[in-house]
Amino acid sequence: MKYYILFFCYCCINVLRAQENYEIQVYGSQTQQKNSTIFELHSNYTFNGETEVVKGVRPTNHALHETIEITHGITESFELGFYLFTNYLSEYGFRIIGTHLRPRIMTPSKWNLPVGLSLSAEIGYQSPSYSEETWSLEIRPIIDKQWKKFYASLNPTLGIQLKGVEEQSAPAFAPNIKMSYAFFKNIAFGAEYYGDFGPLNSFDAAPEQGHALYVVMDLLNNVKWEVNSGPGFGLTPATDGLVFKVLIGRRVYWKKK
């Protein structure tokens, strides 16, 4: 099984775009526990964003994005996630934007790797009024490590457009990075970086790339609840200037742990 997973990782690396402001999260390697489900609500409000319709895509300025995510642990190292994306703008009202499916596999603990390692593949549809990519595939390797109170995670994400406004010349490179420190027993503070460099064979010009930095708080050591929240600041003209995100999750264990 070990070699099949490694081969799958190698193949996926040769395919796939950054998260838009619907699900803003740097993944950890741990999959959802077997026979348990986590119900998550991602609430992201754009205080300062795009104000014009660009390539048929509606503005993000003062948009409220609510995403429902449901993830179930199938085995000790495999989970399946479902997303429902919604958008509210005062001039357009409330809209359902699309849905995604995301299977994820994690390396077994018995391998005793020095880092956590998992791989997710996310595929789905978004309305052309809210995304330049109507059908897309995302491959997300996840590498993380805990050193006592310090935590770091790297998601060197690749995205491929299956259908969209314009043809995509190559997979897009969209890395995500998280670093945090547990200043308190149950609370950590840290930073999250979200990038979108553009196609691998020809990165976008620097002002056209997406780069954002979030200052975040995480709830720790709670088997039932997950909380991640904080403001994000766009670092380039192509990135929304100010977004505030709140992620609240509730785990349900269908059988005794």
What annotation goes with each model-predicted range?
Residues 1-22:
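Bacterial Sec-dependent N-terminal signal peptides
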Residues 18-257:
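Transmembrane beta-barrel domains of Gram-negative outer membranes and organellar outer membranes
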